Amino acid sequence: MLTDMNISSRASLKNITELGADLGLLPEEMMLFGHTKAKVELSVLQRLAGQRKGKLIIVTAVTPTPHGEGKTVTSIGLTQSLNAIGQKACACIRQPSMGPVFGVKGGAAGGGYAQVVPMQEMNLHLTGDIHAVSSAHNLGAAAIAARLFHEARLGKKEFEAQSGQAFLAIDPNEIRWHRVVDHNDRCLRQIHVGLGDNNGPEYESSFDITAASELMAILALSHDLADMRARIGRLVLALNTQGQVITADDLGVAGAMTAIMADAIKPTLMQTLNGSPCLIHSGPFANIAHGNSSIIADDIALRLADFVVTEGGFGSDMGFEKFCNIKVRQSGQAPAAAVLVTTLKALKANSGLATEVDSNVSNIHVPNINATNINAPDQARLEAGFANLNWHINNVARYGIPVVVAINRFATDSDAELQWLMEAVNASAAFGCEISDAFSQGEAGAIALAQTVVRAAETESQFKLLYPDEVSLEAKLSTLAEVGYGAAGVSLSIEAKQQAQQLTALGYGHLPLCMAKTPLSISHDPSLKGVPKDFVVPVRELVLHAGAGFITALVGNVMTMPGLGLKPGYLKIDIDAKGEIVGLG
């Protein structure tokens, strides 16, 4: 079979203006970037304010493995197949970060005959939104550092006299706004700034990957430009010497940060291999952020299409949980149905029968199954791994959403094992189960899946949140740990307990939680496979994201700045003699 790059490069593409017109966009509602992509103006929301909305489908997966489950392949394939059976469908997915592209995971445009094209344009830069987020974020960091420098240099009286600004009395030990870059770079996890003469007070700082920036979450959760401006103004950049918050509005930098992101708030329109529309917007990770594409993209697509297919990052304990408890809480747009992606490989890998350390991913345990024997029939391992799938089925169902299981077929899969798995799923709480061949067959490979999803979406969804706003932060943590993960309980560090009290006292106790934990286990420990039991979730820190509207709980050893492994993806990427990019995939 051809590589993803080969398939993408051979694709016959619609002109982007034709694609937009087919979706229902007017020429003036598209800001063109060549012939293959365009930003969508938010004025379309005003024009279609009274339009009946379509149905939202959320795609999630079992606990992820290094073998890949094909969630984006399924999202794109389902969108293509919905259009093929006469439904008007649009996909809404996140913009890939270049960190994973050059790291282990690779691109995020789908694959095979179910991908967004041109895939190299999607995976590298796109229309520059991530760069805009990085620049706006780092302007905030530069502004707080400069203010600290000038206030320390001049003192209160002289600073106010010379600058005409209020003295903020920034506590250098309480600067909460650090810097970001869109690469995996572990050496930037802990740094000192202000070293040397005349460079400002020295303080400890760090870099996060841009996908973890609160601005990325704001981009994904804003309803319009005015909402984004208000949210950026609420960003907590530091505390003063009295323990009070200093916001981006207090610093006077919120307007400039918003200006940098003024075009980034517009989703980017691209197409799949069969000419189905796809809106790409925002890129928060699901392990260290809320892991879903934007509310704005969904809102535009829902006013133009019968079905909108979106996805949450990683497994249902990660992106799907945050889709429900953060995104839907803020958007008010509940899904009509969910698709849960699995593979035979994933279930065997999640069987918990053996593990080893993957040499390419530091501190991540993966199944001790090489590429040869994981493809071989192994009924015992498959049955043991089914417990993980069944847990995810029940996890989705607890939100009142009908769930359709999609088995992403590989060429090496055993027909007997596929048949056993379908029978096992049909005996579970799932609405239905279908095998998807979208990777190898494109739109023709997911027709049955599309038909079953349509039937599931016609049932009455009884969506419900996992917890209400008004309960305490400690109660929310307990609910997420015990109900959301099946834990025996939750333990807070001394620092986390103090932060919970402080956040409540400052008036932020009503906010939802964003759990930052490993995606490689339902628990906090990546070595615990299958369906872990009798574990306690350790919360080491609570981080306020007042602009985004949630509080992040850092669990276990999760990092907000990834590192590159022994065999990073950039080793394969180059330019050929024709000037074409090669090695992406």
Swiss-Prot record:
- The Enzyme Commission number assigned here is 6.3.4.3
What is the main EC category here? ligase
Q: Sorted alphabetically, which SUPFAM superfamilies does this protein's record hold? A: P-loop containing nucleoside triphosphate hydrolases
Q: Which GO terms describe its biological process?
A: tetrahydrofolate interconversion
Database matches in InterPro entries: Formate_THF_ligase (IPR000559), Formate_THF_ligase_CS (IPR020628), P-loop_NTPase (IPR027417)
Sites where the protein binds ATP = 65-72
Q: Name one GO molecular function term.
A: ATP binding
Give disulfide pairs as residue numbers.
Answer: none
Q: Give the metabolic or biological pathway.
A: One-carbon metabolism; tetrahydrofolate interconversion
Coiled-coil region:
none
Q: Which reaction does it catalyse?
A: (6S)-5,6,7,8-tetrahydrofolate + formate + ATP = (6R)-10-formyltetrahydrofolate + ADP + phosphate
Q: Which UniProt keywords apply?
A: ATP-binding, Ligase, Nucleotide-binding, One-carbon metabolism
UniProt cross-references to PROSITE patterns, sorted A to Z: FTHFS_1
Q: Which domain of life is it from?
A: Bacteria
Belongs to which family? Belongs to the formate--tetrahydrofolate ligase family.
UniProt name for this protein: Formate--tetrahydrofolate ligase
> What organism is recorded for this protein?
Shewanella baltica (strain OS185)
